[in-house]
Amino acid sequence: LGLASKGSMLNNWTPWCNSDVILCFLLMEKDQERLDRAVAQSVQSMDLFLNYIQKDGACEEGPAYWGAAAGKVYDYLQILYDASDGAFSLFGNERIRKMGEFVSRSYIGNGYVVNFADAGARLNNPSELIWNYGHAVGSREMTDFALYCLADPASGKFRNPVITGNDAYRALETVRFNPLIREAADSLNRLAATG
């Protein structure tokens, strides 16, 4: 995770593994000294990853990796934010915001993204993750994009967000924030019905 060899390439595995490992330690480790060491090592690894990312926040692996790279950075930071009762927060950091906004800035329409690296050209954007991340960093661009991803052109309505089942932490986060995005989508549906 970047700690063994200085200057090594870091990729989406760094935040992905760190978010899963830190969650397990916080939930299961009873020895405070061991927990403190795990948190310190994990934060050091994530610091290396965040310093590896360019200032524009782009994921060099392509937009298809956004959920595993920037998305897992969000998960990691939200876990530490919640575990510290808000004392630990990087959500005001510009690079963190730009990493989140990369998903909307790489989108070119009709489900397509600017394709590079080994990423696919079509992307099923995880609207609930984009909403949660955007809400945390205060990005109207991201929350608007999350709602855009819920739009159903055939019906002219906004769908309810989906609770993903393949990532337990994200599923629980979606349940926690679901009322906010659902109310925004319902509000847009009411507005469309009156217009």
Region roles according to the model:
Residues 68-195:
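Carbohydrate-active enzyme catalytic cores, enriched for enzymes
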Residues 1-113, 119-120:
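Aromatic-lined, polymer-binding surfaces characteristic
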